[in-house]
Each structure stands twice: as structure tokens, then as C-alpha cells.
């Protein structure tokens, strides 16, 4: 498929609605207007017109908007037809447009891809369009809009410019070694490098917040049967999401709930009670429980406080702890404090967090909520943030690593050439975020996740 083709797609969600929009972009958009509308509308003015079939009969009537390139979303000629939102009507109009030579259905995200290729958006802004559509909270939506308006890109571009300036100094020190001022040893380059590292650390902190807003945190509730796992799921979700009985093994499959804690998405997973099961269905449920545990960001180790006084997970169930993935964070949740009379709250035991609560009464649930938020480093007071994806975090981490290696070369051996190379690599990593240096394969993966009409 060529970027010279003219593309068309429905820009509104499928199904019935008051308004349905078809978007056309490319060189043939002008021909589509002449054929379907009988005229070329005045640029950027709403024109109420009939939408005509091949024989001249009306298929629908509605608003036509004409945006000649380069002053359009894609940078190409763009025509938008806003008609009635019935699927049959839109399908008839789409088929009519596709009868014209050189016009084809758009690939997912192709409109945004063309906007990127025509320098109307950088890659981070293009990704923000999809993130804005998929936002699951008000805070995520606001942060996605900030990214779309260039907040994230501006921070990255500032770092790139600072690195460019620093590289000039380093290259000058390499190319003109006989000058009176030795830029490598007089401390100026070190001071500038430290400034860039500090700025990058600040951006990484904000990016981690943005990633939490977008990705959320996956928390798996695990433990023995009848420890109160399903009751905890219901308490966190604020509704009866799981069946709760006194019968051991009631939960046999994985149950998922998605909630928000001050804007941070939390993916809670209730699992089957872990034990040696003879029942085939329960055994499969336990296998799935372990699969979820291995992919978790944190495990809530649920303990029935009426069965043991132990608080160290290694003492409570050593075989369970031994099987957990290395470095997986664990929070021990001692349940049924309403029965045992334990003091509600949170403490630390041998490097693990310990929360005492009652899932049945809801006492102590707020303590657990705050603990989950703090354990991920989520800051609800951070204003003007932006959303970030995992690839952004990886690129920022790579840039930080190159800068630290460059600093080591500078202070350890005054190796200007090696410092210059590390600065170049750091700059390249940052430029991957905005798409200045990005492989075609990565671009294809990013835009293929978009809506068809975007």
C-alpha cells in the first residue's frame, strides 16, 4: 500500500448514532468531493449538501467540510462527510466513494501516520491521540491531552537541544586540543552534563507517573482457600464482584476487576485458593492463579488471621514464598481483624509490608488503598503531567545510562571521543520518542493499534 493512495474510513464508532462521519485524505479527495457532492466546498466552511450515488440520486444529506492541504490534520487534502449515523447509510456512502479509482480503505491509524509523516505531529503526539481515546479516568484524559498538545515532546526536545549544545563543546575540545581553554578538564562540560542528567531524571519521574496513569498496576490476591480473597476483591471494587461463601474452593477461576485509586488504574485479580486439589476444575484454576501471580506487579498474600499468629510470610507458608518469582513485591494482608481484635494499620516485617484489616467489614481497606498507591510511587498532586508508554520509559532509561557512562569516561579518563559517542547515543535514544530516529517496523506496530478512522 502506498502513502500516495487516497484513503477513506469511518471516523465515528460503528453502530447506530445521530451522526456518522466518513473521512477522506489524499490527492483524490478533491475528485471525491466533485463526484459525491457535485462541487468543491469552500475551505473550512460547513456546507449542507446531498451525498450523491453514481446515478445522481441522493444517498444521504449532511455537512461537508473541505480542508485543502497542507492545512489539515494529515497535511493532505481532507474531506469530511457528516451524515446520519445509520450503519446501512454509512456503508452505502463508503461503497460509493470506493467506486472512484485510486481510493481505498484506510489501515488502522493511517490518518495519524500520515500526519506524522507530513510533520503535522511527532510520534509522541500521535500516540497521545490513541491514549486520549482509551483514557479510563479524567486524570488520564487530561494527561493524554497534554501530550497531544506537545508537553512531553517539549521536554524531550529540550533535552535533545541541551545534548546538541554539549556535543558542540566536546567536539570543540577534541578538534582543537591546542586551545588555551581545555573544555574537558575545566569543569564546564561536567557541570553541563550534570545539568542534563538532572533534567532527564525529572522527566523520567514524570514519565513513570504517566505510565502508571496509562498502564495501571496489576495486583493479584493469592492465598489459601477461605482466607477472604474474594471478600477483599469485593471491598476494593466497592461491589459484589465475586461470590463469597464459607465453602473452601468457591473461586475456581480468575476474576478481574478494574478500579481507580485517585486516578491510577488498578487491575485487581482474585484467584483460586492455593492447595493440592484433586478436583480437575479446581486444579486448572490453581494453575491459572500461578500464571497470574508470575505476571503481577504486586501480590497481596491473604492470610486468615484466625488460623495463625505469624506475620512473616516465610513462617506462614514457606513453600508459597519459595515459588514466587524473584523480586516480586509482596504485601501480607492479615484478614479478619474484626474477629481477632488486631489493631488495624500497616507495618513492616522482614522487608515486607503487613496490613491488618477486615475485608468483611471494610475496616482497614483505605489503608491498603493508600499502600498500593504509594508502593507504585503514584503522586496525585503532580499537575500538568503527560502520559507515557513503556517504550518511552525504555528510551529514557537508555539515554540516562549513556549519560552516566559518558560521565564516567569524562571523569575517569578525560576521554573526549568516548564521551562524544555516549552523548550521541543518548540523543538518539531520546529522538526515538518523538520519531526523529525510529525504525519503520516500530512505526508499523504503533499505528496498527489505532482506530481505523484515526
UniProtKB/Swiss-Prot annotation:
Mg(2+) binds at residues 230, 251. GO terms for molecular function: GTP binding; GTPase activity; metal ion binding. It comes from the Bacteria. The keyword GTP-binding applies. PROSITE patterns: G_TRME (PS51709). Its cofactor is K(+). Binds 1 potassium ion per subunit. InterPro entries: G_TrmE, GTP-bd, GTP-bd_TrmE_N, GTPase_MnmE, MnmE_dom2, MnmE_helical, P-loop_NTPase, Small_GTP-bd. GO terms for cellular component: cytoplasm; cytosol. K(+) binds at residues 226, 245, 247, 250. GO terms for biological process: tRNA methylation; tRNA wobble uridine modification. It is found in: Cytoplasm. It is an enzyme of class 3 (hydrolase). The keyword GTP-binding applies. GTP binds at residues 226-231, 245-251, 270-273, 335-338, 358-360. (6S)-5-formyl-5,6,7,8-tetrahydrofolate binds at residues 23, 80, 120, 454. Its EC number is 3.6.-.-. Its main location: cytoplasm. Residues 216-377 form the TrmE-type G domain. Exhibits a very high intrinsic GTPase hydrolysis rate. Involved in the addition of a carboxymethylaminomethyl (cmnm) group at the wobble position (U34) of certain tRNAs, forming tRNA-cmnm(5)s(2)U34. PANTHER family: TRNA MODIFICATION GTPASE GTPBP3 (PTHR42714), TRNA MODIFICATION GTPASE GTPBP3, MITOCHONDRIAL (PTHR42714:SF2). Belongs to the TRAFAC class TrmE-Era-EngA-EngB-Septin-like GTPase superfamily. TrmE GTPase family. Homodimer. Heterotetramer of two MnmE and two MnmG subunits. This is tRNA modification GTPase MnmE. The gene is mnmE.
Amino acid at each position: 500500500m502506498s502513502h500516495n493512495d487516497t484513503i477513506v474510513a469511518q471516523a465515528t464508532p460503528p453502530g447506530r448514532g445521530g451522526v456518522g462521519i466518513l473521512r477522506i485524505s489524499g490527492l483524490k479527495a478533491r475528485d471525491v468531493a466533485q463526484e459525491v457532492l457535485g462541487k468543491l466546498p469552500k475551505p473550512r466552511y460547513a456546507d449542507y449538501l446531498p451525498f450523491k450515488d453514481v446515478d445522481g440520486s441522493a444517498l444521504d444529506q449532511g455537512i461537508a467540510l473541505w480542508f485543502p492541504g497542507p492545512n489539515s490534520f494529515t497535511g493532505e487534502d481532507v474531506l469530511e462527510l457528516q451524515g446520519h449515523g445509520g450503519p446501512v447509510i454509512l456503508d452505502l456512502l463508503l461503497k460509493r466513494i470506493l467506486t472512484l479509482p485510486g481510493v481505498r480503505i484506510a489501515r488502522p491509524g493511517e490518518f495519524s501516520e500520515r500526519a506524522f509523516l507530513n510533520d503535522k505531529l511527532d510520534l509522541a503526539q500521535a500516540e497521545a491521540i490513541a491514549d486520549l481515546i482509551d483514557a479510563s479516568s479524567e486524570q488520564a484524559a487530561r494527561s493524554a491531552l497534554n501530550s497531544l498538545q506537545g508537553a512531553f515532546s517539549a521536554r524531550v526536545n529540550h533535552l535533545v537541544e541541551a545534548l546538541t549544545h554539549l556535543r558542540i563543546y566536546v567536539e570543540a575540545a577534541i578538534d582543537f586540543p591546542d586551545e588555551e581553554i581545555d573544555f574537558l578538564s575545566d569543569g564546564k562540560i561536567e557541570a553541563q552534563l550534570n545539568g542534563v542528567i538532572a533534567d532527564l531524571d525529572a522527566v523520567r519521574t514524570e514519565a513513570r507517573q504517566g505510565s502508571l496513569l496509562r498502564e495501571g498496576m496489576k495486583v493479584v490476591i493469592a492465598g489459601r482457600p477461605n482466607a477472604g480473597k474474594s471478600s477483599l476483591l469485593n471491598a476494593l471494587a466497592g461491589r459484589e464482584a465475586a461470590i463469597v461463601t464459607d465453602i473452601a474452593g468457591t473461586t475456581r477461576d480468575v476474576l478481574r476487576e478494574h478500579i481507580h485509586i485517585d486516578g491510577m488504574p488498578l487491575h485487581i485479580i482474585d484467584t483460586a485458593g492455593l492447595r493440592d486439589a484433586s478436583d480437575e476444575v479446581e486444579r486448572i484454576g490453581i494453575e491459572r492463579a500461578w500464571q497470574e501471580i508470575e505476571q503481577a506487579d504486586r501480590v497481596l498474600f491473604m492470610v486468615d488471621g484466625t488460623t495463625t499468629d505469624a506475620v512473616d510470610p516465610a513462617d506462614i507458608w514457606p513453600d508459597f514464598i519459595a515459588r514466587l518469582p524473584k523480586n516480586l513485591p509482596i504485601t501480607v494482608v492479615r484478614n479478619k481483624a474484626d474477629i481477632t481484635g488486631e489493631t488495624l494499620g500497616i507495618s513492616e516485617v522482614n522487608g515486607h509490608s503487613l496490613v491488618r484489616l477486615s475485608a468483611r467489614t471494610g475496616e482497614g481497606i483505605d489503608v491498603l488503598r493508600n499502600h498500593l498507591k504509594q508502593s507504585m510511587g503514584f503522586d496525585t498532586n503532580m499537575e500538568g503531567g503527560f502520559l507515557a508508554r513503556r517504550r518511552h520509559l525504555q528510551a529514557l532509561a537508555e539515554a540516562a545510562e549513556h549519560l552516566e557512562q559518558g560521565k564516567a569516561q569524562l571523569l575517569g579518563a578525560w576521554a573526549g571521543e568516548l564521551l562524544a559517542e555516549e552523548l550521541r547515543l543518548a540523543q538518539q535514544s531520546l529522538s526515538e520518542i518523538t520519531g526523529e530516529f525510529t525504525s519503520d517496523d516500530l512505526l508499523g506496530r504503533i499505528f496498527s493499534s489505532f482506530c481505523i478512522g484515526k
